[in-house]
Design a protein with these regions (language model features):
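Short, glycine-/small- and polar/acidic-enriched structural segments
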Residues: 29-170, 176-179, 195-201, 217
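Secondary-structure end/capping motifs
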Residues: 240-322
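Pocket-lining segment of extracytoplasmic ligand-binding domains
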Residues: 184-277
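Bacterial N-terminal signal peptides
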Residues: 9-21
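Conserved C-terminal helix/tail region of periplasmic/extracytoplasmic solute-binding proteins
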Residues: 312-346
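N-terminal secretory signal peptides that target proteins for export/translocation
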Residues: 1-5
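Short, solvent-exposed loop/beta-turn-alpha elements that line the ligand-binding surface or hinge
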Residues: 63, 116-120, 221-223, 297-304
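Signal peptide processing junction and immediate N-terminal pro/mature segment
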Residues: 20-30
C-alpha cells in the first residue's frame, strides 16, 4: 500500500471548512445573545410556575443571554394590566374570563405556551368531598343541591367542576357556590360549612391528611381532554420587537419544565428541584412537596385547545365573559417551535 503525503492545500481546505462550520447559523443560534437582553417576568409563586423558577435558578436564562428579573404578583388579576402596560414582558397567567376578554378586545398579548395541566399522573387539581359524605355522594348526580367552595366562578378549576355537573345532568343554578381561598376551604370542610370544594395541591394533601375530606374525583378522572390550568403570555411589543429574545426565553423555560418533569417522574435531582420550589412558592415544607400530586406540563409546551374552549363556554354561560375570543388569532407557537428545534421533541 502506498501512502501519499498530506499537502498544504489539503490542510488549508480542511481548516477553512472547520471555520465555516463553526460560524454556521446552527452554531450561532446557541451562543448567548450579545448584547444581553433584560426581561421582566411576572409570576404569582404557584407550583405551576416551576419551569420559570427552575430556569432562573439553574441559569438557563443566563445561558441564553437574558437577564431576567422576577416580578411577584399577589393575585392573577394584577398580571394582565402589567403585560398590557409593559411593566412585564412575559408572565404566567391563570385561565380566566379577563384573559379571554383581553384577547377578544385585541389587547396586545400573545398566548405562547402551557404553564400547568391536569393529566393522568399529574392530578394536582381535584373535587374533594367532606369525609362524612362519602356514602351520600357516589355519582355525579349526587352533586345536585350541594354547597361547593370555589376560588371563583371565573377560574379553570370551577369550569372543570362545571363539566362534572354536566355529567350528572345538573345546571350550575342547582348547586351553591361559595368563594373562598384555598386555606379557608380546608377549614370550612373541617367545620362542615361546605359539602365539597375544588382544591389544588398542596391543599388536597393537607385536607385528606387531616381527614376532613376525601379526594372524590381528580379532574383528570372525568375530563374528556387534558385540563389547561395555566398559560404563558408574551406582550405583543416584546414578541415583535425582541423576537430573538422571545425565542431564547422559551428555550430556557422549556428546559426548566423538562427538569421539573424529570424530577417528578424519574427522580432526577428531585431534592434540588424541591428546594427551588420551596424557596419560590407558598409550599415551604419540602417533605410536603414530596407527597403532593405533581403539576402536569406538556413536554413540548403545547396548549390543550379543547380545554381552553370549554372554559370559554363555561364563562360565557355564566355571563362572566363579554365575547368569544378567537384563539387561533392569539396563539403563536413560533417560539416553542424554535425551542423544540433546539432541545428536541419529547
Amino acid at each position: 500500500m502506498t501512502f501519499r503525503p498530506i499537502t498544504t492545500s489539503f490542510v488549508m481546505c480542511f481548516f477553512l471548512a472547520a471555520l465555516a462550520n463553526a460560524a454556521s447559523p446552527a452554531a450561532a443560534q446557541t451562543a448567548p445573545l450579545n448584547p444581553r437582553v433584560a426581561i421582566k417576568l411576572g409570576a404569582i409563586g404557584a407550583v405551576s410556575d416551576a419551569g420559570i423558577f427552575i430556569a432562573q435558578e439553574k441559569g438557563y436564562f443566563t445561558d441564553e443571554g437574558l437577564d431576567v428579573e422576577l416580578v411577584s404578583f399577589k393575585a392573577a388579576p394584577q398580571i394582565l394590566p402589567a403585560i398590557a402596560t409593559g411593566e412585564v414582558q412575559v408572565s404566567g397567567s391563570a385561565v380566566t374570563p379577563a384573559l379571554f376578554n383581553a384577547f377578544a378586545r385585541g389587547i396586545g398579548m400573545k398566548l405562547v405556551a402551557d404553564k400547568g395541566q391536569v393529566a393522568k399522573g399529574f392530578g394536582f387539581a381535584a373535587i374533594v368531598i367532606r369525609s362524612d359524605l362519602t356514602d351520600a355522594v357516589k355519582d355525579f348526580k349526587d352533586l345536585r343541591g350541594r354547597k361547593f367552595a370555589v376560588m371563583g366562578k371565573g377560574v379553570s378549576s370551577t369550569a372543570q367542576l362545571g363539566k362534572a355537573l354536566e355529567l350528572g345532568g345538573i345546571e350550575p343554578s342547582e348547586v351553591e357556590f361559595v368563594e373562598l381561598g384555598l386555606p379557608e376551604m380546608v377549614a370550612a370542610l373541617g367545620n362542615k360549612a361546605i359539602d365539597g370544594a375544588t382544591l389544588l395541591e398542596p391543599f388536597i394533601t393537607l385536607a385528606t391528611a387531616r381527614n376532613v375530606a376525601v379526594r372524590w374525583k381528580g379532574m383528570e378522572d372525568f375530563l374528556p381532554f387534558t385540563g389547561q390550568n395555566g398559560v404563558i403570555i408574551y406582550s405583543q411589543k416584546f414578541a415583535e420587537e425582541q423576537g430573538e429574545a422571545a425565542k431564547r426565553w422559551m428555550v430556557a423555560y422549556l428546559k426548566g419544565t423538562h427538569a421539573y418533569l424529570d424530577a417528578v417522574t424519574s427522580g432526577v435531582d428531585r431534592d434540588g428541584i424541591n428546594a427551588i420550589l420551596a424557596r419560590h412558592t407558598a409550599v415551604k415544607d419540602v417533605s410536603l412537596l414530596r407527597r403532593i400530586a405533581p403539576t402536569g406540563f406538556d413536554p413540548n409546551g403545547r396548549l390543550e385547545i379543547k380545554s381552553l374552549e370549554a372554559d370559554q363556554d363555561w364563562f360565557l354561560k355564566l355571563g362572566l365573559q363579554q365575547g368569544h375570543a378567537d384563539l387561533s388569532r392569539v396563539i403563536d407557537y413560533q417560539y416553542l417551535d424554535y425551542a423544540v428545534s433546539r432541545l428536541g421533541k419529547r
